Design a protein with these regions (language model features):
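Flexible hinge/capping segments at coil-to-helix
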Residues: 46, 114-151
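Secondary-structure junction motif
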Residues: 106, 136, 149-171, 235-243, ...
Length: 259
């Protein structure tokens, strides 16, 4: 009534936006976002170590999460921590919808203007084999050598697979993909018990003694681990503390120093 136009149409089955309602919707969303930001800012000013922290993580980042999560929970017992493991594309979409506070993943192949990425570490795309596999003792492996192996691969859409596909599509080689899976720790388990070879980031094998990572001999073979936040969004006190703990933890420091 205050606006002088009808924003919603109701019938016995549903409520839908009118044309003025569609036009007004972006402003309404911005108002809600601004109100939520103000609430977070006031809470942080009062140093209230309470609330919820929503973190999006891709599967490859699992090795660096455990120590940070346990330390954070001990230090901030009143903050509820929600960790979401998904594909990078899905997590970045969640970030844009403000459903997560930040995302930990590798840098996407194509930058998104609404998202700010800060580097954590660098690693390489690698062939993952059992420790007693014939390739395990090599310092590097070529695509031609991989084409001669039975492969157990991460599914299309996962970052390591996307990175590999970019190089594979430029070659004239055929790769014998015997198995695809979107659960990285199960891939590592299968590879460690067989002669299958997988392709993942070298950092993925951290903490898995039954497998080794052999860098793939490729131009510009570098994967950049990043913290992704929404451009211009307010960063919670809890998020700053979590990321500070993450940067200080030993597993991440080993990754940084290994490159």
């Amino acid at each position: 009534e205050e606006l002088g136009v009808r924003l919603l149409e109701r019938n016995s089955h549903e409520v839908v936006l009118t044309e003025p309602g569609e036009a007004f919707l972006p402003n309404a969303r911005r108002t809600i976002d601004d109100a939520e930001t103000s609430k977070l800012y006031i809470r942080d000013l009062q140093h209230l170590k309470t609330g919820v922290l929503n973190v999006g993580v891709t599967y490859s980042f699992h090795p660096i999460m455990t120590e940070t999560v346990l330390t954070f929970m001990r230090r901030f017992p009143a903050i509820r921590l929600n960790i979401f493991y998904k594909r990078m594309e899905d997590l970045l979409e969640d970030l844009q919808k403000r459903q997560v506070d930040f995302v930990l993943s590798y840098k996407p192949l194509h930058a998104l203007p609404s998202i700010k990425s800060r580097e954590l570490f660098r690693t390489q795309l690698a062939a993952i084999t059992a420790v007693d596999h014939p390739l395990a003792g090599q310092k590097s492996v070529t695509l031609k050598e991989l084409a001669q192996c039975d492969l157990a691969m991460p599914t299309n859409g996962l970052q390591a697979r996307n990175f590999f596909n970019r190089f594979a599509e430029k070659s004239d080689l055929h790769f014998n993909v015997r198995f695809q899976l979107n659960v990285v720790h199960m891939l590592l388990d299968l590879v460690g018990r067989s002669r299958l070879v997988s392709v993942l980031s070298a950092s993925t094998v951290k903490g898995h003694q039954e497998v080794v990572a052999i860098p793939i001999d490729l131009p510009e073979n570098e994967m950049i681990g990043c913290i992704h936040t929404l451009e211009g969004a307010y960063e919670k006190y809890a998020a700053k503390e979590f990321l500070q703990l993450l940067r200080q933890q030993n597993d991440l420091q080993e990754m940084v120093n290994s490159m």
